C-alpha cells in the first residue's frame, strides 16, 4: 500500500498524462490476496485447478460482452488503452453509460453479444423457440438467416468440457464432502445446462474453507431483455473468525426484533434467519463480476426454486471492502468529515454497517397489519427503496442494541455513525438514481432535519451529534417500519418525493470530491503469482 502511494507521488503531473492513462488511474490497482496458511495441503492443490476454471469463465464472458478479444487488443497500440479495454471487457466505458472510448466503435448493443446485432424486437417476438428466453441459450442466425437458439453447453462446448474436467479434478482433492459434491454437480451442470442440483448443493456447504462461485449466473449484461446469464467466477477463502461472529449475531435476531422502537403489532412476526451468511476474502474475480466496478457482497443463488427450498447465501467479501475503504472512503472522509471526528472512521464500523444491513433485511415486518397483503405488494415500485432504507437504519439500530447487550464494545457506536455518514458520500458521489441511492438521500435529509449532523459552511465539513443521531435513528426506524406495516404507499411516496434526491448544496460537495482525483473504484492484480502459488 505504502509503495503504491510512493509510486503515485513520483508520477508525472496530471496535465502531462495520456488521457486514457488518467481513466485507468481512476481505478486504483490492488493485489487481491489473503493468508492461505490455514488451508490443508490438498486445499492448496485445488487452487490452481479452480483458477484455471475461472480463467475459462473469463474467456467466455469476453465473447458474450464483446466478441473477439484478441482482435480488439491488437487494433490498439498504446498500453493505457489496452488496460482500459481489459478493465471494461470491451471498447465501452461501463461506468460512463457504456460510452465508446475507441474511435470508430459504435454504441454497445443493449443485448451485448447474446443476440444478433441486427435482430429487431418484433423478430424476436415472432421467433417461436421455447428456449429463446432461457438463461442458458444464445440467439443466433442459421445459414438461411433465420433465428435459432444455441444452448451454452453447445456454444461453449470446448470451454465447458475443460472446466468440467478441472472441477472434477478439484473435487477429487476436496476433503469436505459437500464441497466435493458441489464441484462434481457443477461440472455436470456446465455440460447439461441444468444448474438446479448444483445450486441446491452449494446451499449445503457450511464448513468449507474454499468457496467457488462459477458458471453463467447474473443477467445484467443482457440489458436488452435481462434473459441471458453471463459467465463469471469468484474464488473465495472463508474468514472463519468473522463468519462465527456473524452466526452469533444472526442467532440474536429474535431478541433484536423485540428491541425495535415500534409498538408490538409492527414486530409480531418472527424474524427470518434461514439464509446463511458468511465472510470471505476473494482471491480471484473472473468474467462478469470483474467488469467495471467490483462487487463487495454476493447474494446467491438467483433461482426462486432454491429460495423456496433452502433460502440463499449472502457472502461478504471482506478484503475487497477493505480496499474500497482504504482507497475511496478514507480519502472522501478526509475531505468531508470534521477533522476531529475522523478518528471515528474505522474499517470495523464500515464492515459492520454493511453486514448488519444484510442481517437487518430479516428484521421488521413482511406482511401489513391491516390486511393490505404483503409489504412488497402494498409498496409496489417503492418497495426496494423503502426496504433498503429499513435495512440501513435497522442495521444502525442493531449496533446500538448489541452494544447494550454487551455483544459489541462500548464506545464503538460513534464509529458506526460517522462511518455511515462517510459511506453515504461514497455511495452517492455518482448519483442517487438506484433504490439504495434514494434510500441514502432519505436518511441524509432526515438526519439533517433532526440535527443528527451539521455542516460547517466555512470548511465544508460535516459533524455528527451523537445524542441527536441516536434519537434520529430510532425515529426514522419507527417511521419506516410504520410505513411498511401500514402498507402506506402514499406516505412512502411523499417521503421520497421530499427527500429521495440530491439537493444542490450536497451536489456541490460531491463535485468537490469528484474533482479531487479520488479513485472511482478498484482493479485487481490477481492470480497464482500474486498468491505465491507459482
Describe these PLM feature segments.
Residues 62-146:
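N-terminal accessory alpha/beta regions
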Residues 14-98:
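N-terminal mature-domain "stem" immediately C-terminal to a signal peptide or N-terminal signal-anchor/transmembrane
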Amino acid at each position: 500500500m505504502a509503495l503504491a502511494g510512493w509510486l503515485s507521488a513520483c508520477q508525472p503531473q496530471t496535465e502531462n498524462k495520456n488521457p486514457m492513462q488518467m481513466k485507468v488511474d481512476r481505478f486504483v490497482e490492488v493485489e487481491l490476496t489473503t493468508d492461505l496458511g490455514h488451508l490443508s495441503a490438498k486445499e492448496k492443490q485445488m487452487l490452481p485447478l479452480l483458477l484455471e476454471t475461472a480463467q475459462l469463465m473469463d474467456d467466455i464472458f469476453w465473447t458474450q460482452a464483446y466478441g473477439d478479444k484478441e482482435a480488439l487488443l491488437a487494433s490498439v497500440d498504446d498500453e493505457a488503452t489496452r488496460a482500459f479495454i481489459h478493465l471494461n471487457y470491451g471498447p465501452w466505458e461501463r461506468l460512463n453509460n457504456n460510452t465508446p472510448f475507441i474511435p470508430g466503435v459504435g454504441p454497445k448493443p443493449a443485448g451485448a453479444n447474446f443476440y444478433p446485432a441486427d435482430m429487431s424486437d418484433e423478430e424476436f417476438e415472432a421467433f417461436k423457440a421455447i428456449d429463446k428466453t432461457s438463461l442458458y441459450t444464445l440467439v443466433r442466425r442459421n445459414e438461411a438467416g433465420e433465428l435459432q437458439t444455441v444452448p451454452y453447453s453447445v456454444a461453449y462446448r470446448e470451454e465447458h468440457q475443460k472446466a468440467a474436467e478441472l472441477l472434477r479434478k478439484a473435487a477429487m482433492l476436496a476433503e469436505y464432502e459437500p464441497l466435493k459434491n458441489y464441484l462434481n454437480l457443477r461440472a455436470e451442470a456446465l455440460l447439461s445446462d441444468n444448474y438446479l442440483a448444483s445450486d441446491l448443493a452449494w446451499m449445503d456447504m457450511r464448513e468449507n474453507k474454499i468457496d467457488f462461485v462459477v458458471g453463467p449466473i447474473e443477467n445484467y449484461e443482457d440489458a436488452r431483455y435481462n434473459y441471458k446469464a453471463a459467465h463469471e467466477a469468484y474464488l473465495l477463502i472463508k474468514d472463519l473468525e468473522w463468519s462465527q461472529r456473524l452466526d452469533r449475531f444472526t442467532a440474536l435476531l429474535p431478541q433484536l426484533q423485540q428491541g425495535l422502537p415500534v409498538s408490538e403489532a409492527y414486530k409480531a412476526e418472527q424474524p427470518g434467519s434461514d439464509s446463511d451468511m458468511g465472510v470471505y476474502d476473494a482471491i480471484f474475480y473472473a468474467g462478469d463480476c470483474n467488469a467495471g466496478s467490483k462487487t463487495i457482497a454476493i447474494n446467491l443463488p438467483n433461482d426462486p426454486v432454491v429460495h423456496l427450498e433452502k433460502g440463499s447465501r449472502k457472502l461478504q467479501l471482506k478484503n475487497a471492502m477493505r480496499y474500497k475503504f482504504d482507497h475511496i472512503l478514507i480519502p472522501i472522509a478526509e475531505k468531508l468529515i470534521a477533522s476531529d471526528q475522523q478518528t471515528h472512521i474505522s474499517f470495523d464500523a464500515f464492515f459492520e454497517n454493511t453486514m448488519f444491513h444484510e442481517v437487518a433485511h430479516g428484521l421488521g415486518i413482511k406482511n401489513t397489519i391491516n390486511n393490505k397483503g404483503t409489504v412488497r405488494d402494498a409498496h409496489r415500485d417503492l418497495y426496494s427503496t423503502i426496504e433498503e432504507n429499513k435495512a440501513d437504519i435497522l442495521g444502525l439500530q442493531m449496533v446500538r442494541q448489541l452494544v447494550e447487550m454487551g455483544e459489541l464494545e462500548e464506545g464503538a457506536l460513534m464509529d458506526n455513525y460517522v462511518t455511515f455518514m462517510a459511506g453515504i458520500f461514497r455511495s452517492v458521489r455518482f448519483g442517487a438514481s438506484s433504490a439504495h441511492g434514494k434510500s441514502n438521500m432519505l436518511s441524509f435529509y432526515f438526519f439533517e432535519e433532526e440535527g443528527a449532523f451539521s455542516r460547517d459552511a466555512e470548511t465544508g465539513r460535516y459533524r455528527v451529534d451523537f445524542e441527536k443521531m441516536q434519537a434520529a435513528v430510532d425515529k426514522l426506524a419507527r417511521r419506516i417500519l410504520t410505513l411498511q406495516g401500514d402498507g402506506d404507499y402514499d406516505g412512502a411516496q411523499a417521503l421520497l418525493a421530499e427527500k429521495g434526491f440530491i439537493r444542490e448544496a450536497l451536489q456541490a460537495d460531491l463535485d468537490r470530491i469528484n474533482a479531487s482525483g479520488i479513485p472511482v473504484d478498484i482493479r485487481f492484480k490477481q492470480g497464482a503469482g500474486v498468491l505465491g502459488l507459482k
